Regions:
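Nucleotide-activated donor-binding/catalytic signature segment of Leloir-type glycosyltransferases, i.e.
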Residues: 286-310
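A charged, aromatic-enriched C-terminal amphipathic alpha-helix characteristic of glycosyltransferases
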Residues: 382-411
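Conserved donor-binding/catalytic core segment of Leloir-type glycosyltransferases
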Residues: 240-258, 268
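Carbohydrate-associated surface elements
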Residues: 204, 219-225, 231
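Membrane-proximal helix-turn-helix segments that form the acceptor-binding/catalytic region
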Residues: 43, 126-136, 181-198
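Nucleotide-sugar-dependent
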Residues: 34-38, 306-311, 318-340, 348-359
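A short, active-site helix/loop in glycosyltransferases that binds the activated sugar's phosphate group
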Residues: 155, 195-218
């Protein structure tokens, strides 16, 4: 399938500012209230520079509502509903977040997808009503609906909200996860097909989506080089001061569906003089990892986004030891851009999505090769290579990404 990407002269648009005065509603799997960076947050923030944006947090499901073990973000949302607090909160100029007050039913366990769809329609109606109430209060009209990979909560919102444009943003292969695949194998192709426009952050996903919708566009990916700036000095993080050279570092969620524990174990075993530092929250599927038995593997936990550059700066080599599966095959590895923006040598698993990074990274096809490439990366370090990496990452800007998104939106609104 041909991957669509609009040329600047295809529509009369030259920059992001050309998308102005629109009312945009965004739904996402990533709630705004979590202090975690995401593509959708970056897109929302930039859209709000010239448009009004309502960022809709995920509705709380029944199972979570009755649970006594709520995390801080969910507890905040729960308390707002329970205490009849303000459901709309100003994030910044032209941007608000919505805490939906409706509780939706927990239905992923249902074996029948047809039954799931019927109850999911009722769930979507509840969410749609919350959104309608919010856009009425804010005075939004003729909305554009941007769905950030939320297949279930956004499945019927095109019909229920009648937006001027329904955009589906595909940036993750959810069908590869056990939780999602039961109903996602049916629902995502249907959602892609009925979306007015599909945009993706990788060429692989654009090709995948174009099977179901010819209006599928690769819009690129941005990297926040204002945060990940390899040209400034950083203090050594306190919890890394006693970790000796060479430090091989990873930042991001520790997820057994994405990370290959065997690669990390091979590095720890074969390169015993090295220290492997893992910075990020542990998902439930990683909590009992056998990697804890290695004395040279360090788990430093979740860090705020603004803290990550100091950790990356302290790494001698950055690693992305992904497991090869349907989830990682086409997933754009944003962390690679962040590593390169800091000028760091990078060793990563070779995947389809990593092909574009090959001239600036060391790509491994096996655990044993990973160790050899780390040693090569350490030996070849130079200011020249560091600057080439920074320049390459710097070419992946959110401005370019949002310009492309703006072109797509304006093209389809004018049809």
């Amino acid at each position: 399938m041909e991957i669509l990407s609009l040329a600047a002269d295809e529509v009369n648009i030259s920059n992001l500012a050309s998308l102005q005065g629109k009312d945009i509603v965004i739904i996402s799997l990533q709630p705004w209230y979590y202090n975690i960076g995401s593509n959708c947050k970056d897109i929302a923030t930039r859209l709000a520079e010239h448009n009004r944006v309502l960022y809709v947090n995920k509705p709380i499901n029944r199972k979570t509502w009755v649970s006594k073990d709520k995390d801080e973000g969910i507890q905040l949302h729960y308390d707002i509903i329970k205490n009849n607090g303000n459901k709309i909160e100003t994030v910044r100029k032209n941007m608000w977040q919505l805490f939906p007050e409706s509780v939706i039913e927990s239905i992923n366990w249902l074996p029948s997808t047809s039954v799931f769809k019927k109850i999911n329609f009722a769930n979507n109606k509840r969410l749609a009503q919350d959104i309608k109430n919010a856009i009425k209060e804010l005075g939004f009209e003729d909305i554009i609906l941007f769905n950030d990979n939320d297949i279930y909560n956004g499945f019927y919102l095109k019909e229920l909200l009648s937006p001027s444009l329904y955009i589906y943003y595909c940036r993750d292969y959810l069908r590869g996860y056990d939780y999602w695949k039961k109903h996602c194998d049916v629902l995502e192709p249907e959602l892609i097909q009925k979306a007015d426009v599909v945009v993706t952050n990788s060429e692989f996903y654009a090709s995948y989506c174009s099977q179901y919708n010819v209006d599928s566009y690769y819009i690129g990916q941005g990297c926040n080089t204002k945060i990940f700036d390899g040209n400034i000095e950083y203090d050594m993080p306190e919890d890394m001061r006693n970790i000796s050279y060479p430090v091989l570092g990873y930042t991001g969620a520790l997820d057994a569906d994405r990370l290959d524990e065997n690669i990390i174990a091979a590095i720890a075993t074969k390169y015993i003089t090295a220290n492997i530092v893992l910075v990020g929250p542990e998902l439930a599927n990683f909590e009992n990892t056998f990697l804890r038995k290695f004395g040279n593997v360090h788990f430093l936990g979740r860090k705020a986004l603004k803290e990550l550059p100091a950790y990356i700066n302290a790494f001698d080599v950055c690693i992305n030891p992904q497991i090869k599966n349907e989830i990682t095959k086409g997933n754009y590895p944003l962390k690679i851009d962040e590593y390169l923006a800091m000028g760091k040598p990078v060793v990563a698993t070779r995947t389809e999505a990593m092909r574009m990074f090959e001239p600036y990274t060391y790509l491994s096809d096996s655990p044993s090769a990973f160790v050899s490439l780390i040693e090569k990366a350490l030996a070849e370090r130079s200011d020249t290579l560091n600057n080439e990496r920074k320049a390459f990452a710097g070419s992946h800007t959110w401005e370019k990404c949002l310009n492309e998104l703006s072109r797509v939106i304006n093209k389809h609104l004018s049809e």
